[in-house]
Amino acid sequence: MSEHPGIVFLAGPTGRRASLASGPDVWEVVRAIKSARTSEPDLTEEDVLALVENNTGVPARMLRIAIRYWASYPDEINSEIAAAQVAEDAAEHAWQRERDLLAG
């Protein structure tokens, strides 16, 4: 994508989604950054990027590419983050119901 070098689009069960050309989906990166910022509110911008880089293996320059894409399309990426959270919550609830049934 010429407007956002380093971003590609992938098709999947949830539709077309923005992804780093050599890494995870943009929504996954943004969620990791938001999580790091929430968990470590006193970190500097560079420290947040270093934390996410160390935890994900995604280089800081690629994290910045994802951030730039999010800055242009925040509603799209935030919607994908919300949809992922709903799916994860549903899976966790189903797992818990299964555990409850088996526990008697």
Walk through the language-model features, giving the residues of each:
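Long, charge-rich, low-complexity intrinsically disordered regions
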Residues: 2-21, 35-37, 50, 54-55, ...
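Short, amphipathic alpha-helical "recognition" segments used to contact nucleic acids or chromatin
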Residues: 23-46
